[in-house]
Amino acid sequence: EDNIENCLLSIENCVDEIIVVDSYSTDRTKEICQQHKNVRFLEHTFLNYSEQKQFATDQASNEWILSIDADERLTPSLEDEIKSLELNDENISAYYINRKTAYLGKVLKHGGIATEKILRLFNKKRGHFADVKVHEYVETNGKSKNLKGYIVHDPYKNLSHHLGKIDKYTTLWAADRYERGEHCS
């Protein structure tokens, strides 16, 4: 609920359709989404992040998918860059996008997560989400290109929220590794 408004505002003018998959939250997310054009709000039981994103991908009526989380937003320059793309090149199956992370509202300039390239725009006929529980990613067949613009990722409300996410993600990561036969001593 806290992030969805800015996320939707950043993408609604550069995509034909917005699919929001919600795992039956009880906040105002649905109400906020229904106030925006081209939004299809779908509820789906949460199993893991990859499964949730693949479900959304499967519901899309277009071949090209821009995958973005609620705590992310496109910069105006990235929005313009996406709108100008010619997406009919059969040799290109995906685009990597730069992502800058903000911490408590301030964009980081240094460190491992300050800026990273992530595959977020892809052709669903040539790509899918890998079967992992956390830190989902897209696997594609074909060539990819890099875009110049960037997404701003602002994932933490406060320190307590940050620590809660660490606990959640490490638990999911450990369960994923255990199910794959990787065990710790």
Question: Model segments located where?
Answer:
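A conserved acidic beta->alpha catalytic loop
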Residues: 10, 22-31, 46, 69
